[in-house]
């Protein structure tokens, strides 16, 4: 189905963003109405953004994290541009999807997981803040990240996914910890076993810096993970490979579309006004994380950050 390409959006509010991971390059459960490419100070997003309507008539913005042809390595995903583009459209919450490896016997391939915590095993290759990187003139800001996922939306997403899949032979887990590794190679067996001793329950290559940047952008963020394999910690079985991952994802297409249909409209009800906790609890949080005095912030940094936060350094 072809949709018109637009240069700006003046239609109904787009409060919800959806980021698709491996195997999820489009959503069959929503109706595309337009496509838009947004230029940000940090470049272009991974893919053109599809503006679509849910079954309840709510407009959402969808982008494919690795591009529509899955041509972008995890370490090379333009995370800043992705988050900034969604913020520019007015997005207040993001529901992100990701394929993950399981580090626990009870989390079987094809199960869904709504994690609550993250262990960062990326290696400093990926830029993880809008406020500076490397030799760039920076602004010192320390966003709170103790609870990396929105604690208002996370239990709602969990209960919605659980209810949606109640008649399916698929378990739904929550209060789990996701390890984010650098990749693109999968774990060694020693690493996989180590992550288990650290308290890791699932593992992927994508949740960071995505979740950190969403926090800096004051966007509520929640992850829906689909287990595809048992990583490499089980000594009696073969280590994970791409064929196994893709087989699990294909088998879960129906469940993923069912989940999407229900979750998006349910989350919308929690963000449709600024007084709802999911929005209110994060709004203006960035203002209180900045330590650099506005009068010494470089003009270029001010210009870039105002794309994200129009109020930035105007005093």
Swiss-Prot record:
Class in the EC hierarchy, top level: transferase
Subunit architecture: Homotrimer.
Catalytic activity: S-methyl-5'-thioadenosine + phosphate = 5-(methylsulfanyl)-alpha-D-ribose 1-phosphate + adenine
Ligand binding (phosphate): 22, 65-66, 98-99, 206
Entry's Gene Ontology cellular component terms: cytosol; nucleus
Enzyme Commission code(s) on record: 2.4.2.28
Protein's UniProt name: S-methyl-5'-thioadenosine phosphorylase
Subcellular location: Cytoplasm; Nucleus
Keyword Ubl conjugation carried by entry: no
The keyword Transferase appears for this protein: yes
Organism: Mycosarcoma maydis
BP-aspect Gene Ontology terms: glutamate biosynthetic process; L-methionine salvage from methylthioadenosine; purine ribonucleoside salvage
Main location: cytoplasm
Molecular function in Gene Ontology: mRNA binding; S-methyl-5-thioadenosine phosphorylase activity
PROSITE patterns: PNP_MTAP_2 (PS01240)
Swiss-Prot/TrEMBL keywords: Cytoplasm, Glycosyltransferase, Nucleus, Purine salvage, Transferase
Family: Belongs to the PNP/MTAP phosphorylase family. MTAP subfamily.
Site (Important for substrate specificity) location in chain: 187, 242
HAMAP family according to UniProt: MTAP
Binding residue positions for substrate: 205, 229-231
């Amino acid at each position: 189905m072809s949709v018109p390409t637009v240069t700006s959006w003046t239609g109904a509010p787009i409060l919800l963003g959806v980021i698709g991971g491996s195997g999820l390059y489009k959503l069959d459960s929503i109706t595309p109405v337009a496509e838009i490419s947004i230029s940000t100070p940090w470049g272009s997003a991974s893919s053109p953004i599809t503006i679509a309507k849910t079954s309840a008539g709510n407009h959402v913005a969808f982008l494919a994290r690795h591009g529509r042809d899955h041509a972008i390595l995890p370490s090379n995903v333009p995370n800043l541009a992705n988050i900034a583009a969604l913020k520019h459209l007015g997005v207040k919450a993001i529901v992100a999807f990701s394929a993950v490896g399981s580090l626990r016997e009870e989390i079987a391939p094809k199960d869904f997981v709504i994690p609550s915590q993250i262990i960062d095993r990326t290696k400093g290759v990926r830029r993880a803040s809008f406020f500076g990187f490397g030799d760039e003139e920076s602004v010192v800001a320390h966003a709170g990240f103790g609870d990396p996922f929105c604690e208002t939306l996370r239990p709602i997403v969990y209960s919605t996914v659980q209810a949606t899949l109640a008649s399916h032979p698929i378990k739904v887990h929550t209060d789990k910890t996701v390890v984010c590794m650098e990749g693109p190679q999968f774990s060694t067996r020693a690493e996989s076993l180590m992550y288990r001793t650290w308290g890791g329950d699932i593992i992927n290559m994508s949740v960071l810096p995505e979740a950190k940047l969403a926090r800096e952008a004051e966007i509520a963020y929640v992850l829906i993970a689909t287990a595809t394999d048992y990583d490499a910690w089980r000594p009696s079985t073969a280590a994970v490979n791409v064929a196994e991952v893709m087989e699990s994802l294909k088998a879960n297409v129906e469940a993923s579309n069912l989940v999407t249909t229900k979750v998006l409209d349910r989350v919308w009800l929690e963000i449709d006004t600024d007084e709802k906790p999911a929005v209110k609890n994060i709004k203006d949080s960035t203002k209180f994380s900045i330590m650099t005095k506005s009068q010494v912030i470089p003009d270029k940094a001010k210009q870039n950050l105002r794309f994200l936060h129009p109020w930035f350094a105007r005093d």
